Structure formats: structure tokens, C-alpha cells
């Protein structure tokens, strides 16, 4: 069976500043919370990462050679404003001008994100987005970038508001490492959506000629047994935490009655309250129809069952399959032993979940305009033997997910592009350097790049726009 993607479809690769650039302390870059947090809590740091700060001409030349016509890049906020606000770092500004020029030189369209998990330490230490002053600082930073970088046509404000709150305040694997505080999770989500809305309104008021949107991670949630009301409720509540709360803010400008009922139930079980103000919803209402596109990051789905017990989450960071546990008081318990393939990190491989999520957006949020799949890929323990990397599992993963994207398009969804995570191997926030995603293998000691088998497959796909199943 042959499936075809549109002629104007973007075949992209994704990166992120902190995961790729390295160079964390040079040319005036300010600190981020991750710098110390990784040293204190993990077995790796963000040095050298992929040394994208110096190697970007190599990576962009490879992108062009292999038919990749789009790249996701994030600007490191602390490279522009080392303290998060105030004095501008001219060397940081010059770096991004050079980077974007190199993108255009190689006919690779940059899709630029303003915040990818890396709030400057000077602001993070004051509460990050739990502190409403951070909204003001983010909007000022965004406004500066919109004006300074007219060579950028496609902007996204935030990458994955959901996992930021989840990582910082629920699982506790991101700085500041707070666990099981659901009120902080929701408040962080809400305040970041306010920052998005203000930046979005500013961009449109200035009548910039480009497009702007937001990237959400949207793992699809299913009841373990659809016939059991408790399992159905568990899936709905977990969906509210990770998906529906932020989607409502993005496209409804408010939280639906069902969403708020779920939030109130979760907080009644776990404690805490939210600061939601009337003027917040005036802002969300003003922004809800201004998003030019939605970026969907999709890697996995989850199956949930009813659970009556205390919260316990164990993050599988070392790729030891079966090491995960996820159960939240008053919400539910994720079940990993289902008839679905999973990675060594217990991520469930389920392409149908991406199709279902796209169609959910189309049905529930018809004002979405268009979608890009801004991250999707397979984390794998790749091995390089004499410069050859056979990653057939990754090819199969990408193929299956692109096939359901083609199905969604044929069903009427407006999906305009796909960005594999990641363009080249980068370091993983909570898994280090062993979990590789790239089309190009990076020898982190020499920084030499090697195209994987998947890179050659992706090159052919970009040329033909066809998927052979």
C-alpha cells in the first residue's frame, strides 16, 4: 500500500537550544537552572551536547543534502538576556542572526521557539512561571525577538507547557525538583498560557508578516477497559492534567465546565488552590483565535485504570524497561503491561494515538487552522560500527506515524508538516546521552556526524512524498 503526503508538506528535523548548543558559559550566556541541577542530580551535563553552537553549518549542510526543508530551533533566552531582562547580550543576538542566515543559505526554513524548558536562572530562582512577574519578562523578551529577527517567519512561544509543569512539580525530574504538587502544575500551565496569549496578541498588534503558534505535547489517554466507568474517568482526568487544560486555554479562552470539574476534583483529592483572575480570561479570550498553527509533539499514548491509593511516580531515566510507575491519588494508574510495543524507557508505541489526537483537535477545537507535528521520534540505544548505524526500528516508527498523518489529512485534517525529533543526536533532559533520536549520529567526543540508515530513508521520503507500507 502506498500513502502520499502533500507536495507542500514540510519534512523537518527538530532541535532545542539547551539540548543541542553546548557552549553554556561562553560569549555572555547567562545561567539556567539546569546548569546546576544536572550537576547535582544527574550523571551528565549539557556540555558538550551536540556543539550546535559551533557545528550548525555542518548540521544545516547535512539537512539540505538529505532533503530536509524545515528545522525547529529554539532561542536560548539567557543568551539574549543573561539575567532574563535588562541588558542585551550582543554576542548572543549575533549568533542567532548567523544561524538563521545559514538556515536560509541551505534552503531550510527555521521554525523558531522562544522557550524550550530553559528559563534563565535569575528568573527561575524567583519562582519561574509561578511568579506572575515572569510573564512580563517573557513578553518583553518575545517582543524583542520579534523585532530583532525579521528573518524568522514562523514563531512558537513555548515548547511543551504540559511537560514543564509535569517535570517541575509532579514528577520532580526538572528543576526545582518538586514532586506531587498538582496545584503548582495547573498554576504553571495557566500562567504560561497567559504569557503565550500576551506574546501572541503583541505579535498580531504589531502586524508582523509571519505566523505564530504554540507547541503542545499531547499524549493520548485511553481507559484500560472502556466498559469500566472508573477506567474511563481515570483517562479523562489524566487527559485534563496533560492535555485538555492547556488546549482549552489555547482555543476556547476559558476552561470548560467539564475541565474545571476535573481540576476541582483533582485538587480536592491532592490539596491546593489556583489563582485564576477575571482579567486572565479576558486575555485568553482575546488570544484564542489568533494562533496561526498548533504544533503537536507526540511520542506515546497511555492506558489508565481506576486507582484508590497514594501518589507514586517512578521515572525510568536509564532505559531499563519495566522500571516506570505512575499513579496519582484521585486520578488513576497508568498500566504499562498492555499489548502494545514499548521502548526501553516504557514509552508506548501507538501510532493510532497520533491519529486520534489530530482528529480530536479537529473535532473539539475547530478553530485550530493548521497543525504541524513538531516532534515525533524513537529514542534508541544506537550503535555506530565503522560509521554505519542500522536503525530499522526508527524507520518503522517514523513510517507508521507518517502513515496515520496521511490518513488524518485524507480525513480532512489540515496537517502541514512533520519534524522528526531529532535532526541529530542531542542530550536528553532526564536520560542523558544514551537515548538517541537523531537522523544523524553524533560522536559526542569528536562531534563528528554520521548519517544513520534512517537519514537515507527520510531523504527518499522527502523526495517522493510517498510512504510504502
Swiss-Prot record:
Q: Which reaction does it catalyse?
A: a 6-phospho-beta-D-galactoside + H2O = D-galactose 6-phosphate + an alcohol
List the InterPro entries hit by this protein, alphabetically: 6P-beta-galactosidase, Glyco_hydro_1, Glyco_hydro_1_AS, Glyco_hydro_1_N_CS, Glycoside_hydrolase_SF
Swiss-Prot/TrEMBL keywords: Glycosidase, Hydrolase
Q: From which domain of life does this come? A: Bacteria
Q: Where is the active site?
A: 160 (proton donor), 375 (nucleophile)
Molecular function terms from GO? 6-phospho-beta-galactosidase activity; beta-glucosidase activity
* EC number(s) per entry: 3.2.1.85
Q: Which Gene3D superfamilies match?
A: Glycosidases
Residues that bind D-galactose 6-phosphate, according to the entry? 19, 116, 159-160, 297, 428-429, 435, 437
Which family does the record claim for this protein? Belongs to the glycosyl hydrolase 1 family.
- Name assigned to this protein: 6-phospho-beta-galactosidase
Q: Which organism is it from?
A: Streptococcus equi subsp. zooepidemicus (strain H70)
